[in-house]
């Protein structure tokens, strides 16, 4: 059965085409900085927003009538959903996908039933991967939707909930390994608090760290070579989450000795909620040595919640890709579309329009970022700004050649009288705009 029979495979037709079901800028085989666009972007489609979400919101019921979401045997519907998903991936031409365990398999009425259902669906997903050539970018476990996780999973006051969560992650990590996944993501949607009046912060942080340590141990025990990634988010659904932003996650990992085992999966909309730019979070992840992967989407700056819209800003993404390219690009990570069509976008074509447009935006932004990397004008001005630190005096400070007192005495003896140099922000912004709009 075909779910998108009337929709052709999406092809590159160039910027002059007016075909809404064609790529206008994403030519997968086009080479930029020595790699194809496909190799740079490593695009993934998420299972949950695209094939699981029924179009509901907190004020209204599901608005979609997806044929794979109709009532029937739960496992059979899961197989139909997988058929629809892989038909979609294939027609879109995207190389990767991502899932939560309960996206792809019915949870059932017990942990044993969950495990059996998930095992059957992992077999089926393996068959679909083999037939299509589509690969798994990352898997994860849903530890936030079921009421048992209302007070958290790893941070729950009930150790039986911790144990259930451990079982889910064990199965999900095993499945990711078996399906050739390149990363495993841990998002602590309920790992936080709603009120401090009933919360023991130290205990919950210790529990969370113990849980992560067990995941790390299991990764090595089964021989999974992919990366473990935490996805930062400041709040929603909890008032405050322990993985607030990249810097918070890094501090947590260092505190518990996990900084060499776990990296971050950065979502653009989560950066917005944390009061940061997407550029900031990516740059910070590289500065702290924990960059892993990206969830490509956007939020609405006028809304205080996670809208998960498709990315549409070449300007924003150019700076994000500039950081990624200047640090060597993705290794195990990629650009996962954690994005959904709007509730009023009920036609099957809308799923394609959202992804096609966003993929074109990624391609445009990456090419503009490549211009910034190739012309080296931003980096040259940055190096010039800090050049004095590369001189003998600056290096002596950094290498421990001075104590605080001896440096103070040296400054007094030399009568230092430093002058402020321009930060040249306006010039730098002009360089970025020239690259984005093709002015130079």
UniProtKB/Swiss-Prot annotation:
Cofactor: Mg(2+)
Binding-site residues, Mg(2+) 2: 267, 270, 306, 308
Note accompanying the cofactor annotation: Binds 2 magnesium ions per subunit.
Residues engaged in binding Mg(2+) 1: 231, 267, 295, 338
Superkingdom, taxonomy of origin: Bacteria
Active site (record annotation): 100, 103
Catalyses which reaction(s): alpha-D-xylose = alpha-D-xylulofuranose
GO cellular component, one term: cytoplasm
Gene3D superfamilies tied to this protein: Divalent-metal-dependent TIM barrel enzymes
Main subcellular location: cytoplasm
Alphabetically ordered keywords of this record: Carbohydrate metabolism, Cytoplasm, Isomerase, Magnesium, Metal-binding, Xylose metabolism
Oligomer and partners: Homotetramer.
HAMAP family (alphabetical): Xylose_isom_A
Name this polypeptide is given: Xylose isomerase
């Amino acid at each position: 059965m075909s779910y998108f029979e009337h929709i052709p495979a999406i092809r590159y037709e160039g910027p002059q085409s007016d075909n809404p079901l064609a790529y206008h800028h994403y030519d997968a085989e086009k080479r930029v900085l020595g790699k194809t666009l496909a190799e740079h972007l490593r695009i993934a489609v998420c299972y949950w927003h695209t094939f699981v979400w029924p179009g509901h919101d907190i004020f209204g019921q599901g608005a979609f009538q997806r044929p794979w979401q109709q009532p029937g045997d739960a496992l059979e519907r899961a197989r139909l959903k997988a058929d629809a998903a892989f038909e979609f991936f294939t027609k879109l031409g995207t190389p990767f996908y991502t899932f939560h365990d309960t996206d792809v398999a019915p949870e059932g009425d017990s942990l044993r039933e969950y495990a059996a259902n998930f095992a059957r669906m992992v077999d089926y997903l393996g068959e679909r991967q083999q037939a299509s050539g589509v690969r798994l970018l990352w898997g994860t476990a849903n530890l936030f939707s079921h009421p048992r996780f209302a007070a958290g999973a790893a941070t729950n006051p009930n150790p039986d909930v911790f144990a259930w969560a451990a079982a889910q992650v064990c199965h999900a990590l095993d499945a990711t390994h078996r399906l050739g996944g390149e990363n495993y993501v841990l998002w602590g949607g309920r790992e936080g608090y709603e009120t401090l009046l009933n919360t023991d912060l130290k205990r919950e942080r210790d529990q969370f760290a113990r849980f992560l340590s067990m995941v790390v141990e299991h990764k090595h025990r089964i021989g999974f070579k992919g990366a473990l990634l935490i996805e930062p988010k400041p709040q929603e659904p909890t008032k405050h989450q322990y993985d607030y932003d990249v810097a918070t996650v890094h501090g947590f990992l260092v505190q518990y000795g996990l900084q060499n085992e776990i990296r971050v999966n950065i979502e653009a909309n989560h950066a917005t909620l944390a009061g940061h730019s997407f550029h900031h979070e990516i740059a910070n992840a590289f500065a702290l040595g924990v960059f892993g992967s990206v969830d490509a989407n956007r939020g609405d700056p006028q809304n205080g919640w996670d809208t998960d819209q498709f990315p549409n800003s070449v300007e924003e993404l150019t700076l994000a890709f500039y950081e990624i390219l200047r640090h060597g690009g993705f290794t195990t990570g990629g650009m996962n579309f954690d994005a959904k069509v709007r509730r009023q976008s009920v036609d099957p074509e809308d799923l394609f329009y959202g992804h096609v447009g966003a993929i074109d935006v990624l391609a445009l932004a990456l090419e503009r970022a490549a211009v910034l990397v190739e012309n080296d004008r931003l980096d040259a001005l940055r190096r010039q700004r800090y050049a004095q630190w590369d001189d003998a005096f600056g290096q002596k400070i950094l290498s421990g050649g001075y104590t605080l007192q001896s440096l103070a005495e040296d400054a007094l003896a030399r009568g230092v009288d430093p002058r402020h140099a321009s930060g040249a922000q306006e010039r730098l912004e002009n360089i970025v705009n020239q690259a984005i709009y093709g002015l130079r």
